[in-house]
């Protein structure tokens, strides 16, 4: 994507824009890493110490209205709701960030790619000034998450969609196999700081989960030595998702309810005990997740795609992507935002239903009603009462977004069809791909539109569903792209017959 001329210009820009602080950061990157990269980090003067960047909790309603009410909370406070019961949002001092121009930020973020200097080797913490600027490097709990590849879906785009510029952001290529790592590194790092400042304020961290959040929470808490508790809906997550928190030492509670029931319970528990809430109702996680949007811009050499399609369940991630793109636009790193698509499973589609009733996003809030989610292969988005509904609606309105749905057969067929072109998709990515197929069929998305599908988890976490599909063992589903194994005898003739049949030899 990047030409030699562009690379030369970028290199020149880095040299021209280098300040004493950025040059010191670059010098660290050029040195050999010490045995203890945390100790090495302590020897540096962090960028945020040289500047006056800060962040705090404010009511999300202030962000919606564009008017600051004056209500705010320190990120060191254990607080999840505003005084009126609404959600909170992490608000950055944009004026302070804007004092350093877009060339400065682009050069700084680009310079941190590929380093092992703590903590900037992480795709999240390479944007630390835009995430948690006041956090000490020594408090950070990171597994060098992020920096996931942007897969050019050349063959799938051409053959299935007639598209020339289709990409898949592989957020599932991460430590625990899902995008949830991006948010959990931020939340657990802040908890690590709070526990040091106020030793008895937090005894454990808990979450309700459809599988991926619990895996990320348990892994990051284990790395930090912090106890974790996960509430899982019984028999509604994959075996791979279940075993992850068990292996990482979490207290795993398998509860006879759905995700929404687990969510109600964890909110009650965290309200009455010193257990910290890790669900996306806590906006700290969204600060990490927004960095995937910034990564996409970096990977396109700071060019903005036309469309970004995101699977939606609890709906925090679409707001996180919106926030990342919005910050880049407001600070001048790019001059526009992509249009956003929220893709929901038909069996858990309250936002899609509201979008259809409202005939668009303008009056979508008035049309919204929670639903009772039905079973879906896309189990991580099997949510009927999403916590971040207001966040998602704001994102869709501001980004001229749309909402699409996918049936069980559509999502499984889309995932399997794309798998045949070199991918290995989770069912949630199948939802997004199925939505894209529909939008192309209606010509909402053009053949030459640069489009990014966000893949939220690794397909290996959902191997059971793939086995069922390719075995044609899914009731009431034709499984048209199934590729079942062929059983043959230990005989050359039988083997040759199978090969000839397959390849018409």
Label for each model-derived stretch:
Residues 12, 30-33, 206, 401:
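Small side chains
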Residues 37-505:
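PLP-dependent amino-acid enzyme catalytic core
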Residues 1-4, 23-44:
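N-terminal mitochondrial targeting presequences
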């Amino acid at each position: 994507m990047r030409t030699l001329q562009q690379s030369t210009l970028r290199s020149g820009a880095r040299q021209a824009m280098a300040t004493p602080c950025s040059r010191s950061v670059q010098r660290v990157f050029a040195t050999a890493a010490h045995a203890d990269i945390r100790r090495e980090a302590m020897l540096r003067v962090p960028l945020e110490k040289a500047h006056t960047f800060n962040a705090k909790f404010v009511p999300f309603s202030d962000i919606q209205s564009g008017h600051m009410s004056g209500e705010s909370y320190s990120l060191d406070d254990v607080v999840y709701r505003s005084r009126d019961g609404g959600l909170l949002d992490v608000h950055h001092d944009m004026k302070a960030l804007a004092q350093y121009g877009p060339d400065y930020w682009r050069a700084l973020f680009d310079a941190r790619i590929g380093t092992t200097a703590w903590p900037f080797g992480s795709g999240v913490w390479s944007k630390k000034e835009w995430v948690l600027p006041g956090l000490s490097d020594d408090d950070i709990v990171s597994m060098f998450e992020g920096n996931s590849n942007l897969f050019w879906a050349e063959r799938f785009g051409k053959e299935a969609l007639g598209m020339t510029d289709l990409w898949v952001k592989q957020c599932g290529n991460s430590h625990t196999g899902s995008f949830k790592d991006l948010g959990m590194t931020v939340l657990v790092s802040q908890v690590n700081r709070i526990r040091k400042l106020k030793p008895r304020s937090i005894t454990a961290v808990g979450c309700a989960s459809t599988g991926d959040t619990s895996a990320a929470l348990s892994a990051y808490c284990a790395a930090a030595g912090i106890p974790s508790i996960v509430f899982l809906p019984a028999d509604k997550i994959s075996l791979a998702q279940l075993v992850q928190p068990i292996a990482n030492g979490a207290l795993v509670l398998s509860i006879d309810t759905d995700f929404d029931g687990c969510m109600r319970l964890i909110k009650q528990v965290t309200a009455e005990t010193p257990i910290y809430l890790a669900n996306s109702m806590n906006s700290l996680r969204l600060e990490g997740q927004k960095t995937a949007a910034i990564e996409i811009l970096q990977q396109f050499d700071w060019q903005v795609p036309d469309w970004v399609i995101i699977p939606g369940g609890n709906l925090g991630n679409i707001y996180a992507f919106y926030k990342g793109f919005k910050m880049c636009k407001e600070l001048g790193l790019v001059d526009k935002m992509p249009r956003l698509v929220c893709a929901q499973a038909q069996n858990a589609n309250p936002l899609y239903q509201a979008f259809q009733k409202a005939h668009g996003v303008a009056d979508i809030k008035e049309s919204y009603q929670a639903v009772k989610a039905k079973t879906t292969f896309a189990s991580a988005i099997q949510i009927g009462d999403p916590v971040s509904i207001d966040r998602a609606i704001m994102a869709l309105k501001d980004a001229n977004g749309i909402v699409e749905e996918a049936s069980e057969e559509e999502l499984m067929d889309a995932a399997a069809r794309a798998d045949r072109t070199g991918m290995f998709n989770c069912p949630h990515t199948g939802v997004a791909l199925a939505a894209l197929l529909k939008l192309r069929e209606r010509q909402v998305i053009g053949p030459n539109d640069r489009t990014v599908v966000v893949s939220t988890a690794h397909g290996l976490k959902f191997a059971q569903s793939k086995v069922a599909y390719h075995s044609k063992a899914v009731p009431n589903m034709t499984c048209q792209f199934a590729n079942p194994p062929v059983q043959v005898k230990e005989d050359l003739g039988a083997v040759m017959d199978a090969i000839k049949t397959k390849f018409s030899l």
